[in-house]
Amino acid sequence: MLAKQFISKSLASSLRRLLPVSSTASSLKGSMMTIPKFTSIRTYTDSPEMPDFSEYQTKSTGDRSRVISYAMVGTMGALTAAGAQATVHDFLASWSASADVLAMSKAEVDLSKIPEGKNLVVKWQGKPVFIRHRTPEEIQEANSVDISTLRDPQADSDRVQKPEWLVMIGVCTHLGCVPIGEAGDYGGWFCPCHGSHYDISGRIRRGPAPLNLAIPAYTFEGSKIIIG
């Protein structure tokens, strides 16, 4: 116990020699004097006002979304209009017949090469056309028929432009077969598919066909005929 007290006193004496109390106190006093004193504390309400930048700020997200939506709708509308214009242009262009199509829509036939009492079959728009150079006897026979007895009443004069030339589409009005010329019970045309008989004016006289053979549009130009 005495030894511990002795050691404590020795250490205290050594510390006093190394750090004098007066100098340490004066140092601490000097350092305390340099600490500034706060006379007041600025609160949030005393702070200077911040500048207002609201007029320079972007609009709300809702306004921006609406602008983007309007822009997208406008762009899609413009693209749709352009596509529709191109489609209409292509559609109308397809209606403009080319020179080849116009040429195929007409058929020109030299009538001087068809002997009297004979038929000629030509192709027009993918269909056969019968051209008959009728004899005077055939013309007389065609005009002697009582049209009131016909299934499809039609005078011969209503079916020809010139009595000696009969021009018809060679398609049976029953189911579309091609009749045979100079055949049948009436000296005109006979359809072998279902037995329809046509006379020398191309009028239906017997069989299932409901109508006379059709007459195409045609014109005469000198010794030629233009079909179509």
Swiss-Prot record:
It is a single-pass membrane protein. PROSITE patterns: RIESKE (PS51296). [2Fe-2S] cluster binds at C172, H174, C191, H194. One of its GO terms (molecular function) is ubiquinol-cytochrome-c reductase activity. Disulfide bonds join C177-C193. Binds 1 [2Fe-2S] cluster per subunit. This is Cytochrome b-c1 complex subunit Rieske, mitochondrial. CDD domains: Rieske_cytochrome_bc1. Component of the ubiquinol-cytochrome c oxidoreductase, a multisubunit transmembrane complex that is part of the mitochondrial electron transport chain which drives oxidative phosphorylation.
